[in-house]
């Protein structure tokens, strides 16, 4: 799976490299974990970088990466017969996504978009340390900036990690 994704990413880089106009973006996001992840994490925070090319009048596509951290710190207490009460505190974890990104302008200021790729977990337990990564989003552009709302998710072997995020990005270039 990783090799197939890498070949696809290289093909995307090659196809987009022929385009003449592109923009570099840098941003940050904050989010609330949802689903099962909400039981062990209170917050998702991170930074993003992307490079997108203008492929059509209202359509951009490119590559994105960054770092996203899911906080831990929730404490659970269990009563074990013969041992008393045992408390366990959850630990935080981070991801580094590598994804293709696309954006379609539905008006001069509003856009819909998404990211699709692979997320590498920064904490590995000796096994395969990653998952399929996806993030549909909707946003508003103003001047050289954008504000977006997204649903970030990672999925592997029927398990998923997800959060609802609010992000801000600054665009360098046009």
Which residues are covered by each model-predicted region?
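Short glycine/proline- and aromatic-enriched beta-strand/turn motifs that initiate or cap beta-hairpins
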Residues: 19-61, 161-165, 171-174
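Transmembrane beta-strands of outer-membrane beta-barrel pores
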Residues: 30-36, 45, 53, 67-71, ...
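Membrane-embedded beta-strand positions of outer-membrane beta-barrel proteins
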Residues: 26-28, 63-65, 100, 112-114, ...
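Repeated loop/turn-to-beta-strand initiation elements of outer-membrane beta-barrel proteins
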Residues: 57-61, 109-112, 142-149, 174
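Mid-chain, well-packed structural core segment of small domains
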Residues: 105-127
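Cleavable N-terminal export/targeting peptides
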Residues: 1-23, 174
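Residues that define the transmembrane beta-barrel architecture of outer-membrane proteins
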Residues: 22-24, 41-45, 92-96, 120, ...
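Flexible, solvent-exposed loop segments that connect beta-strands
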Residues: 32-41, 68-94, 120-130, 157-159
């Amino acid at each position: 799976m990783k090799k197939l994704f890498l070949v696809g990413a290289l093909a995307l880089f090659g196809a987009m490299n022929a385009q003449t106009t592109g923009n570099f973006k840098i941003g940050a996001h904050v989010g609330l974990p949802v689903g099962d992840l909400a039981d062990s994490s209170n917050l998702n925070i991170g930074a993003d970088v992307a490079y997108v090319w203008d492929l059509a009048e209202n359509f951009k596509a490119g590559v994105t990466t960054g770092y996203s951290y899911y906080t831990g710190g929730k404490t659970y207490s269990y009563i074990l017969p013969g041992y008393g009460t045992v408390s366990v505190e959850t630990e935080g974890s981070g991801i580094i996504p590598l994804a293709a990104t696309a954006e379609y302008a539905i008006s001069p200021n509003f856009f819909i978009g998404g990211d699709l790729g692979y997320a590498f977990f920064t904490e590995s337990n000796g096994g395969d340390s990653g998952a399929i990564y996806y993030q549909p989003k909707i946003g508003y552009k103003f001047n050289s900036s954008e504000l977006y709302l997204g649903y970030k998710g990672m999925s592997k072997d029927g398990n998923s990690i997800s959060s609802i995020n609010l992000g801000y990005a600054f665009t360098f270039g046009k």
